[in-house]
Amino acid sequence: MINATQLFKIALPIILQNFLSSFVNMLDTIMVGQLGSVDIAAVGLGNQVFFVMNLMVFGAVSGGSIFISQFWGKKDFEGIHRTSGIMLCVSVAITLFFTIVASVIPEYCLRLYSKDPDVIKKGADYLRAVAPSYLFFGLSFAFANAERSTEHVTLPAIATICSVIVNAVLNYILIFGIKVTGADGNSIVIIKAYGVTGAAIATVFSRIVEALIVFVFAYVRKYEVAVAPSKFFIKQPGFLSKYVKICIPVLINESLWGIGISMQSSIFAHSGTDVIAAFNINSTVSNLLWPICLGCGSATAILVGKTIGQGKYKEAEKLAKNLCALITLIALVLGLLLIPLTKVLPFIFKVESEVIAMASVFLIMKAAVYSLDSFNMCSVVGVFRSGGDTIFALLMDVGLMWVVALPLSWLAVLVWHFPYWAVYACILIEPLCKAVLGFIRLMSGKWLHDVTEG
């Protein structure tokens, strides 16, 4: 049986990587937050395009990771190479589409979330500038996930560290500019302040650095996934159809879930600019601790998938139950830590006191369901998918969101005119119901399938 030491050996670099990625988003929000509520709203809504794209890429790549983890358990390197090639192709196709959309029709995208012309204008400037980063993100994300699925978790973390440093330095320079005082006492502009556009340019350069490190050093160190490009396209009769059968539900799952989360921003945007600014602050701060749960969930997927690939099915069932319980307990503690963070919001975000008050309420409500969110993530991403149970994961993960939570929330805003906290309560019905369904499925053991057989 895999012990806690082995779990955290894999989880810690992933946690670090995910934490730093969240920190970059928070850093963007904090720095742009010095410019005002409109700028926070513009960047937050602009990033909804990336959020939806990210989840589609995550879905396609996660589907491939199911195969790679199980192939890794079998030491089937040809299967690993073939799957990695498909992951790269699909990831590039998705990110290319979103690059074109963000470059050509950014205003149309933003009107889905806000009617404020100032927010739309600044958000469009941000999207046009940040769009080139999507392709580099797609390449590095797919290849880094292939590396992690073969238990090479350190290099992706190092790449993210370097990316964060580049992003932080360029953010400061390009958002605020650089001025020096001349001998006559007048300010001389060395580098112009670009505001939200500067934040986007910094993101582009940081993504380029990340992609270069993930690829170059994998080949230098001769990782299992770092092979000649021709080996990525070795054909095996029936494999592509099997890949599609497993991955399409994951891709649909992540796409619908991402659009649903994005719709939450649209719901609050219809309540006013201050409400959406508060909701963006809540999302940024609560997501800062989420990488710990996500890292443990990703490690669970690797370990459970590898154990299934080794043919140890009973051990995989027991492992899945133990790890879900552990991660839920960790998240319970982390959720409690969100509450004192409400006291430091006024010192971090230079926005109106009403926005801070609303963000604090959002955070306290989020803390109440943090452990449920974590269990749902671990069961869906870490267990059901690694066991090839992607159709049930799809139905559980997005069914309640689209059938219950989103319709209730829209009615609460547009028809019943509920206050912001009551609207959020409608959204938070979802994780409670989802956790009940996930627990029943986990205990049944019906989620376990060896997708590499045959």
Predicted segments with their positions:
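Short alpha-helical transmembrane segments in multi-pass integral membrane proteins
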Residues: 1-14, 68-133, 177, 183-247, ...
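N-terminal transmembrane alpha-helices
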Residues: 2-30, 34-35, 51-63, 67, ...
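Transmembrane helical elements of multi-pass membrane transporters/channels
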Residues: 9-28, 129, 140, 163, ...
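Helix-terminus/linker motif at the lipid-water interface of multi-pass membrane proteins
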Residues: 19, 23-41, 110-117, 173-194, ...
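Alpha-helical transmembrane segments and their lipid-water interface positions
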Residues: 21, 25-28, 32, 54-61, ...
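Interfacial/gating helices of multi-pass transporter permease domains
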Residues: 32-51, 83, 117-122, 196-197, ...
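Small-residue-rich hydrophobic transmembrane alpha-helices
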Residues: 40-100, 137-156, 265, 278-342, ...
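Short runs within selected transmembrane alpha-helices of multi-pass transporters and secretion channels
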Residues: 61, 130-149, 156-167, 199-214, ...
